[in-house]
């Protein structure tokens, strides 16, 4: 049962207490402005998540949700590699309306 739980981490949590790189987790915060880069030859995407204290790099290979935008809340599920300070995501969730921020992200931004 424990192995099926995805714990939530902010960028500061990942900096201060990184999980094992073989454990799937959720990381969230705001998509940092001007950090979004797309590979023109593939679906590979790079962006950064910030909690306004620390920032982590995120790589993702796939289509982003329509509501994914810079300076908006996001939760990524995947694996964090502390040696690269990089989060490799296999799922990206974006907020679903203008006023919604996931509770975990809101708490991380406090």
Feature map (PLM): residue ranges:
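OB-fold and OB-like single-stranded nucleic-acid-recognition modules
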Residues: 1-110
């Amino acid at each position: 049962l424990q192995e099926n739980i995805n714990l939530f981490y902010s960028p500061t949590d990942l900096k201060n207490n990184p999980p094992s790189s073989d454990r799937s987790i959720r990381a969230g915060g705001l998509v940092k402005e001007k950090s979004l880069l797309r590979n023109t030859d593939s679906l590979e995407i790079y962006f950064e998540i910030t909690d306004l204290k620390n920032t982590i790099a995120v790589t993702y290979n796939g289509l982003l949700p329509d509501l994914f935008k810079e300076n908006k809340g996001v939760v990524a599920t995947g694996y964090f590699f502390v040696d690269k300070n990089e989060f490799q995501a296999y799922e990206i969730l974006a907020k679903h309306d203008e006023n919604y921020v996931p509770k975990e992200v809101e708490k991380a931004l406090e």
